[in-house]
Amino acid sequence: MAKIDTTSRLTSLRGFMKERNVQVYIIPSEDSHSSEYIADCDARREHISGFTGSAGCAVVTLETAALATDGRYFNQAAAQLDSNWTLLKQGLQDVPTWQEWSAEQSSGGKNVGVDPSLISGATAKNLAEKIRKSGGAELVPIEGNLVDLVWGKERPARPSEKVIVQPDELAGESVTNKLTKLRQELEKKRSPGFLVSMLDEIAWLFNLRGNDIPFNPVFFSYAIVTPDVATLYIDDSKLDDKCRSHLSANKVEIKPYDSILDDARKLHASVSEKGKSENAAPTGNFLISNKGSWALKRALGGDSSVDEIRSPVGDAKAIKSEAELVGMRACHVRDGAALIQYFAWLEDQLVNKKATLDEVEAADKLEELRSQKSDFVGLSFPTISSTGANAAIIHYGPERGSCATIDPEAIYLCDSGAQYHDGTTDTTRTLHFGTPTEAEREAYTLVLKGHIALDQAVFPKGTTGFALDGLARQHLWKNGLDYRHGTGHGVGSFLNVHEGPIGIGTRVQFAEVALAPGNVLSNEPGYYEDGKYGIRIENIVVVKEIKTKHKFGDKPFLGFEHVTMVPYCRNLIDTKLLTSEEKEWLNAYNAKVVDKTQGYFEGDDVTLAWLKRETAQVE
């Protein structure tokens, strides 16, 4: 991973900071919609720092610069940041958060600047309080992004790809029904409206899909839903006649994307004016998501006029319709078949044919095999194809032309996924094509045991992913081992591969939302030896109600249904470490994989032989 000399970029940025009288400037990773994955034109933190990971925040003062990121990216950030930068390893003891570091730098009456469209209103409020307590001046909303000024004419144009309709038979629910349910939420809160800013929520709400952000079938847009009107803010050039007809049939108005702030101000003025009327019924505040930007909150009137809530659209989206669940099961079988073909091909090339393949060449083959499956649209994220020590970099990204050659005598980790019209996939398998060490086999088996434990979990309704996280880590913990990432994330239906608000892990938000039937999320424990190897095993699971002998407190009990259909690496399993119950689970899983996928391999002797060996009975 090459370092970029950021000296001139930082010098230029500091010049613009001085012009606006800010001594500290914050550059988040997200775009104006709080997206995790962003378009190239919004990669501001990457441009100023040289760090390409998907999560992190840069903070620049007139003398220093710091980059904060989490444990998934410690190795990558250390490799990519040049000497201008200090790495803040979030989550480690005595390491300040980027908010704390920003506030510390503001002491002595310094101003802290930020683009108000890139942080949430809640974050801005908390940060302003920290700045005040640290002796700083204030948090200043800087209209016009300063990194964009540094970037200049080299900044990529904003994408404007066409939008398509997601048919009701795949979505499982009409736009009209979704809007009716949202308006019922507004009525409960006596709210005059909800502003939707998350791109995947808008795509889901209006049964549309786009292609503005790589790997994520979303499109740049906002929406405002009131008791009477639903308005989609989108560039008109994105819509064809079919989309316009679809929106019209569902009584959705269309307005220009760039008019959202003006309309938000007008809405605030209108609601305020109505509230002054003697005969007006009392109303609550306008609603925005707690991930909605500070700019949107300010336009709607600020704290006194706006309530920031967990998005009811996001909550509804996380509980998949029956049609979406049917699609998720089906696409994971097709996707599993592609992965089985890939792993069989890769082993044949490396071991039998003694071929030389680098990480990207292998990933290209996997994409080719996936593209041959029905309803394939594209990848759901860049394939993590990693050999040996590269596998220890949790979100490693091989670079074409300069990546490593796959070593058959080292661990190979492949984390990959695809977008299909009927669902989104995300699967990780760790393999070894030679002779693994005892330490590697032990670590792999401990990870597998945690993976199985979570898959078999049964828990009462109301349980959160926060409460389940330890199940996946327990066998690692018993041996003094652990991993620095979450155990599970929500997955969209032909939408973002990372989807909130649910998840399994130690993040605070995972303790706030209980898992519910219809949730789709990942089960992906791991273990990483820096500079040596990495192990991760990932399946996608569906939350469902489980029949139990008793029902304590008259509560239903829930569990998981795995939909991923790919064998585990037989070469890395130390069966002596497995209990009889775990072996039984593994045999049942393997039998299901064979039953669901073998029909794809007629006449493919290499794949059939590989599948037979990898799914052989564990005694």
From Swiss-Prot:
<dbReference type="InterPro" id="IPR000587">
    <property type="entry name" value="Creatinase_N"/>
</dbReference>
<keyword id="KW-0645">Protease</keyword>
<protein>
    <recommendedName>
        <fullName>Probable Xaa-Pro aminopeptidase P</fullName>
        <ecNumber>3.4.11.9</ecNumber>
    </recommendedName>
</protein>
<dbReference type="GO" id="GO:0070006">
    <property type="term" value="F:metalloaminopeptidase activity"/>
</dbReference>
<dbReference type="InterPro" id="IPR050422">
    <property type="entry name" value="X-Pro_aminopeptidase_P"/>
</dbReference>
<keyword id="KW-0479">Metal-binding</keyword>
<dbReference type="InterPro" id="IPR001131">
    <property type="entry name" value="Peptidase_M24B_aminopep-P_CS"/>
</dbReference>
<dbReference type="Pfam" id="PF16188">
    <property type="entry name" value="Peptidase_M24_C"/>
</dbReference>
<keyword id="KW-0378">Hydrolase</keyword>
<keyword id="KW-0031">Aminopeptidase</keyword>
<feature type="binding site">
    <location>
        <position position="524"/>
    </location>
    <ligand>
        <name>Mn(2+) 1</name>
    </ligand>
</feature>
<dbReference type="Pfam" id="PF16189">
    <property type="entry name" value="Creatinase_N_2"/>
</dbReference>
<dbReference type="InterPro" id="IPR033740">
    <property type="entry name" value="Pept_M24B"/>
</dbReference>
<comment type="similarity">
    <text>Belongs to the peptidase M24B family.</text>
</comment>
<feature type="binding site">
    <location>
        <position position="426"/>
    </location>
    <ligand>
        <name>Mn(2+) 1</name>
    </ligand>
</feature>
<dbReference type="GO" id="GO:0005737">
    <property type="term" value="C:cytoplasm"/>
</dbReference>
<dbReference type="Pfam" id="PF01321">
    <property type="entry name" value="Creatinase_N"/>
</dbReference>
<keyword id="KW-0482">Metalloprotease</keyword>
<keyword id="KW-0464">Manganese</keyword>
<feature type="binding site">
    <location>
        <position position="538"/>
    </location>
    <ligand>
        <name>Mn(2+) 2</name>
    </ligand>
</feature>
<feature type="binding site">
    <location>
        <position position="415"/>
    </location>
    <ligand>
        <name>Mn(2+) 2</name>
    </ligand>
</feature>
<dbReference type="GO" id="GO:0006508">
    <property type="term" value="P:proteolysis"/>
</dbReference>
<dbReference type="InterPro" id="IPR029149">
    <property type="entry name" value="Creatin/AminoP/Spt16_N"/>
</dbReference>
<dbReference type="GO" id="GO:0046872">
    <property type="term" value="F:metal ion binding"/>
</dbReference>
<dbReference type="InterPro" id="IPR036005">
    <property type="entry name" value="Creatinase/aminopeptidase-like"/>
</dbReference>
<feature type="binding site">
    <location>
        <position position="426"/>
    </location>
    <ligand>
        <name>Mn(2+) 2</name>
    </ligand>
</feature>
<feature type="binding site">
    <location>
        <position position="538"/>
    </location>
    <ligand>
        <name>Mn(2+) 1</name>
    </ligand>
</feature>
<dbReference type="InterPro" id="IPR000994">
    <property type="entry name" value="Pept_M24"/>
</dbReference>
<dbReference type="Pfam" id="PF00557">
    <property type="entry name" value="Peptidase_M24"/>
</dbReference>
<dbReference type="InterPro" id="IPR032416">
    <property type="entry name" value="Peptidase_M24_C"/>
</dbReference>
<comment type="function">
    <text>Catalyzes the removal of a penultimate prolyl residue from the N-termini of peptides.</text>
</comment>
